[in-house]
Amino acid sequence: MDIEDIDVFIGIDVGKSEHWATALSRDGRKVFDKALPNDEDRLREVYQRLQAKGQVLVVVDQPATIGALAVAVAQDMGIT
């Protein structure tokens, strides 16, 4: 995958009970910017909504610890 293939970039700052997620479109518009519970169903809902805008890239600041669920859900949904 090349960076040119990405339509939506999601950055997730993870926390124990909830995360903060900000998503930008390719042209830099903010398309999501709010708290995101550390909950599989809610993560899937947000990821699906953003996938409707195109190819998604998820970046998590702590992927091996409390951010593992956000990464696992993204991978399960075919998100890079």
What residue ranges belong to the model's regions?
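Phosphate- and other anionic-substrate recognition elements at nucleic-acid/protein interfaces
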Residues: 1-80
